[in-house]
Amino acid sequence: MTARIVSTFGVAGLLRLKSFSGEYAHLATLKQVCLAPPRSRSSGTLACALPREAVHMVEHVLLRAQDALLKLHRVDTVECARTFVGAELRVPRAEACPLSAGEFYLADLCRCELVFEGSAVGVVLSVVEGGGSSLLEVQRTHGGVCYVPFHRTFIGDVDVGRKKIELLQRWILE
């Protein structure tokens, strides 16, 4: 996931994007994008009308100070554009925002093993937007799903290469 369509803009079918990384420059050269309904059941209050994931051709992207405007081919009215609000914009990793040393994409946390004091206690299913921090949706080893704030109070070392995330406070799984 690179961005989310948060609203329409104007009457000509423009879509306002909010980048998950906060970076927008890499969006300017996109020729096509994959748009999909939000992955997680808990991805916020935006209701996306897209029935399934699909590839769309990009006419242009206008970068602004705090967001970007996306114009898709054949999306020429605000009514048509509204069906995309809430959708997630996905691009090939090569076209995503470049990472600095020690950084990772939130999507890389999915399927990582959550480990407490050397023992596996769960697997990350998805990353959900939360108020103060993102939340890891975790399938607990002994059953059930819970949410763990992705915050230094609860999360220690993250090794996406080994697919391991250190949990610092076990009680948060209860």
Curated annotation (Swiss-Prot):
Keywords: Chaperone, Cytoplasm, Ribosome biogenesis, rRNA processing. Its main location: cytoplasm. One of its GO terms (biological process) is rRNA processing. It is found in: Cytoplasm. Residues 101-174 form the PRC barrel domain. SUPFAM superfamilies: PRC-barrel domain, Translation proteins. GO terms for cellular component: cytoplasm; ribosome. One of its GO terms (molecular function) is ribosome binding. It comes from the Bacteria. It holds the Pfam family PRC_RimM. Belongs to the RimM family. The PRC barrel domain binds ribosomal protein uS19. Binds ribosomal protein uS19. An accessory protein needed during the final step in the assembly of 30S ribosomal subunit, possibly for assembly of the head region. Essential for efficient processing of 16S rRNA. May be needed both before and after RbfA during the maturation of 16S rRNA. It has affinity for free ribosomal 30S subunits but not for 70S ribosomes. This is Ribosome maturation factor RimM. It comes from Treponema pallidum (strain Nichols). The lineage of its organism: Bacteria, Pseudomonadati, Spirochaetota, Spirochaetia, Spirochaetales. The gene is rimM.
